[in-house]
């Protein structure tokens, strides 16, 4: 049962020390010394991080912490200045994104990239891997890809059904609402049957009702044995769905741990609110009252 | 001159040699720009390569063992076309879309100026001579001076050229249709919409963009080959950037990313251009219009066609065959 595997992975995390760079019992993705700087600005400086297989890991941090840059580097959309990282034991340092996707590591984007002038079904079919008909020569001989296409279509319909998009299959993806596009992007990523799904801010711009269904979908993905990593700002969602939380600030990983513990961590609170957030701005404490400025 | 003559002229031009050349180039552009979203502003470079390959190989290098006949020359022309696509594509297709646009528009001019200033390649005089002997030798039409189809009248050579032109177009349309309904075509359309999304789904976009550039370039080169064979003359100043912009006009007029879009566009574009010209000449001839000289008609027809296109863009921005629903979508 894949569900059991997920449960095991999650319970295994309970034994992991809540420290930055902690070793996981069954790491799927391991990154070492990843460094990315833009001129003098160090955007990412991650010494060591491991992502537990079969679990949902959240990557959080204040704006400008380098989460998305780290994400882009790992998924091949940006090049690191230094560092190595591996996926399922294979080194994938600076590997092109399309090769990563073929290895079973697929990502979504913060700004949804639904292919507007393609139908929802075509979006889904584009996700399927290893298609014979995507070779230029084979494409003019339909008998080489018709059977495969039919299978992919059936698989796409099942996924669309699950994501409540089946009725929209023949509509242009551009006619979907923002939330539906998020769903489509997630469903399309699953067409690749990935081992690891990386979601970049899956909740950005999604209404609360749809958020709940997105959360359920993310849990379902894990139950099927797929590992999930996501970047998110929404703390409720992080608390709700993630098994493990990694906190970044100023390019570094400053904390790791179970969601509740991490949110009580003083380093995390300091990173989000500033170390002196609960102190008065002035020594006397009354200069902020009305009238002093006039 | 009467209205019948005006219409006959317009129809014969709309299906004639020039329209076929533009149509072939535009069909290539449809694959590159319409389906894949590649901004090739130098389609004329591919056309020029085709024309000049035939001109140089058949006339300048006449009797050379390297080019025994027209068919081999056509093969070389197509190979040169692939080479040109690689030269243009390798450095630019990994970069943002605008770089290809800059490189292609420059390449078109570079190629024209190199041909114009190199005497071995014809120089400013261009190349004139017999370029399609083998082609005209296999003309299966019976030996007679004129062939009449209703009001249209063709010489024996013209009817052969036009027939072959449209047969080639029909075959290439069939090829385009087969390619674009396949998963390969779906990847191209995906690249047009958002390249990064396609890359994130495990497809090499660089390879597909290169294939589209090469294929579209070959279509343009076939137009160039056809040009040299049909007109038996290659002039450097025919290969100006405006050619590519007329192709874009035809493509957008007919409807981009539609298999038949370029055909509809080319027919209407050439029909209108010639109809307006001949109609104005008719009106000047019979004294209805007195404020124009016949020599002013040439530029004025472009003004009128331009106005017509503006109206089309306002009232039917998706082109004749386009789908308005599709255009209304936020493309990014």
Language model features: what each stretch is:
Chain A
Residues 193:
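Conserved catalytic motifs of ABC-family nucleotide-binding domains
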């Amino acid at each position: 049962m894949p569900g059991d595997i997920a449960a095991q992975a999650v319970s295994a995390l309970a034994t992991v020390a809540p420290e930055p760079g902690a070793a996981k019992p069954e790491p799927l993705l391991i990154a070492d010394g990843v460094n990315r700087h833009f001129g003098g600005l160090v955007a990412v400086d991650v010494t060591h991080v491991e992502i537990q297989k079969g679990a949902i890991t959240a990557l959080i941090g204040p704006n400008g912490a380098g989460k998305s840059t780290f994400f882009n580097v790992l998924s091949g959309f940006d090049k690191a200045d230094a560092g190595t990282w591996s996926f399922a034991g294979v080194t994938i340092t600076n590997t092109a994104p399309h090769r990563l996707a073929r290895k079973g590591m697929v990502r979504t984007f913060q700004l949804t990239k639904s292919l507007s002038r393609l139908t929802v079904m075509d979006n889904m079919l584009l996700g399927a891997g290893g298609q014979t008909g995507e070779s230029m020569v084979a494409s003019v001989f339909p008998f080489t890809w018709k059977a495969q296409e039919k299978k992919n279509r059936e698989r796409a319909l099942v996924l669309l059904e699950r994501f409540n998009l089946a009725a929209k299959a023949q509509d242009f993806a551009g006619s979907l609402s923002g939330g539906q596009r998020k769903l489509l992007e997630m469903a399309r990523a699953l067409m690749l049957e990935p081992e690891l799904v990386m979601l970049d801010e899956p909740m950005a711009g999604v209404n609360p009702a749809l958020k709940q269904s997105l959360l359920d979908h993310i849990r379902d993905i894990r139950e099927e044995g797929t590992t999930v990593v996501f970047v998110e700002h929404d703390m409720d969602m992080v608390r709700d769905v993630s098994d493990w939380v990694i906190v970044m600030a100023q390019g570094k990983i400053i904390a790791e741990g179970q969601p509740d513990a991490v949110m009580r961590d003083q380093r995390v609170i300091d990173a989000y609110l500033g170390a002196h957030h609960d102190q008065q701005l002035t020594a006397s404490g009354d200069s902020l009252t009305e009238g002093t400025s006039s | 001159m009467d209205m019948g003559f005006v219409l006959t002229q317009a129809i014969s031009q709309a299906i004639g040699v020039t329209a076929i050349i533009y149509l072939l180039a535009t069909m290539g552009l449809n694959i590159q720009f319409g389906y894949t979203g590649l901004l090739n502003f130098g389609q004329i470079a591919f056309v020029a390569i085709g024309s000049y390959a035939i001109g140089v190989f058949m006339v300048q290098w006449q009797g050379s063992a390297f080019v025994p006949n027209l068919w081999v020359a056509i093969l070389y022309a197509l190979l040169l076309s692939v080479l040109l696509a690689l030269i243009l594509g390798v450095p630019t297709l990994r970069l943002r879309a605008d770089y290809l646009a800059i490189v292609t528009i420059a390449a078109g001019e570079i190629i024209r100026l190199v041909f114009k200033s190199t005497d071995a390649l014809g120089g400013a005089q261009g190349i004139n001579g017999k370029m399609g002997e083998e082609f005209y030798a296999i003309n299966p039409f019976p030996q007679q001076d004129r062939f009449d189809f209703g009001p249209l009248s063709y010489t024996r050579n013209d009817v052969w050229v036009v027939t072959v032109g449209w047969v080639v177009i029909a075959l290439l349309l069939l090829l385009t249709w087969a390619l674009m309904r396949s998963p390969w075509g779906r990847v191209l359309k995906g690249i047009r919409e958002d390249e990064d999304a396609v890359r994130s789904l495990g497809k090499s976009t660089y390879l597909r963009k290169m294939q589209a550039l090469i294929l579209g370039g070959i279509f343009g080169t076939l137009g160039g080959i056809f040009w040299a064979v049909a007109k038996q003359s290659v002039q450097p100043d025919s290969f100006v950037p405006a050619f590519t912009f007329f192709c874009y006009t035809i493509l957008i007029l007919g409807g981009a990313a539609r298999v038949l879009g370029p055909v509809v566009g080319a027919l209407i574009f050439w029909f209108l251009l010639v109809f307006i010209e001949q109609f104005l000449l008719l009106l000047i001839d019979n004294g209805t219009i007195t404020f124009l000289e016949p020599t002013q008609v040439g530029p004025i027809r472009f003004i009128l066609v331009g106005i017509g296109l503006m109206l089309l863009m306002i009232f039917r921005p998706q082109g004749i065959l386009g789908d308005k629903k599709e255009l209304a979508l936020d493309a990014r």
